[in-house]
Amino acid sequence: MAYKTEHITQQLRAAREAQKMSQRELSARSGLTQSHISQIERGTMEPGLGSLVDVARALDLEIVLAPKKLMPAIRNILDSASASSDVLTSDQRKLVGRLERWFAQHRGGFGSASEADTFKDSLALLRHLPLSAEEMDTFNEATARLDRSQADPPSRQELSRIAHAVRHLRNAAVHRDRDDAVPRSAYALDEEDDNA
């Protein structure tokens, strides 16, 4: 097997085994024969792109092309997401849930659909990324602003400030160093206007 696909096929096998799925079950889900899957996993057959996509999707995975410069952030997100299920506090889960429910009711209050989508996407990421105590304080403050405005909907300017705070939290959590010896990446997930 070519070195280029070896790590991908190893990840697919690990995903299948983690889901306690047999090759036969994977065969039924993917449409590939069990012997084809076995050959791919053993490295005796170089899988075609279509086969890789079929197997990945049968395992509830996606194969995507991403810009190389974003790989540190993507790896950080994937590492955080896989490790965060036991790490997130119930307070963080509650805050994200409250903001998601609030957002569902007040989506139209944002200045643009793009700003609303970014806010929603930021919340989705924050559901999986553990926050520090300081970041939780900022998150609590943003949520408290919304609580104070229950009687009167917040102005677009206030929504923009809250959205900026949530984006900042998301970026901080995504770019947080896992090891102090590793320098932080010099990029953001989206453009932010700090003068807003």
From Swiss-Prot:
Residues 12-66 form the HTH cro/C1-type domain. Residues 23-42 bind DNA. It comes from the Bacteria. Residues 174-196 are annotated as: Disordered. Pfam families: HTH_3. One of its GO terms (molecular function) is DNA binding. Keywords: DNA-binding, Plasmid, Transcription, Transcription regulation. GO terms for cellular component: cytosol. PANTHER family: HTH-TYPE TRANSCRIPTIONAL REGULATOR, METHYLPHOSPHONATE SYNTHASE. This is Uncharacterized HTH-type transcriptional regulator y4dL.
